[in-house]
Amino acid sequence: MIYEKGYDTTIGEFGCIKHDQHTFIGASPDGINIDPKNIRYGRLLEIKNPCSDRKLNGIPKKIYWIQMQIQMEVWDLDECDFFETRFKEYSSEEEFNEDGTFTETKDGKMKGILIHFQGKEPIYKYAPIGLTKEEFDIWYDKQMEEKPGELNWIKNIYWYMDNYSCSLVVRNKPWFNSVVPLFQDVWNTILKERVTGYEHRKPKKKQKKTKVFK
């Protein structure tokens, strides 16, 4: 994983858990730093990969900031790294090979390969970061040998990391305490309408206007 390699840490993946007090609130972060020797130990991780070419300035959108605040409250942790990346795809294997080394572009950016398989849904296998050409060939052959029979190879995708940003977001308990009543009101409405129904929330059909020709 790029974040793990860049910050020499280990990220653990966890499922969704409920808030200790407000059990109607749950959160599942992209990961948590679990290396006790690392300065980021105990820090949450939120990853975004925007498709647009907007500048990565380290400032999360409001909805992402709220998401991270809820995650920190649920997990009772005080810090979260907001990690944004932008990847670009090479047009061909030849273009990939001509740009720098097997692991870096000419201007020092990280690059790599992933495999696109197709079954009922698309499946992507990501080669570990930093493999040599020889190590990649061994990994690649293993993926092809071990893939289930119902999966079809579609193509190899050659990529480089065009840009990235990592910024620290800290916990804001006063904000969370101020919005909990709003969350509670919404949850109370959900509980009520599970019983009474929510048909009234369906969009109303527009009545067709009858055209009158004179």
Predicted regions and their residues:
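Accessory terminal regions of nucleic-acid processing enzymes
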Residues: 1-214
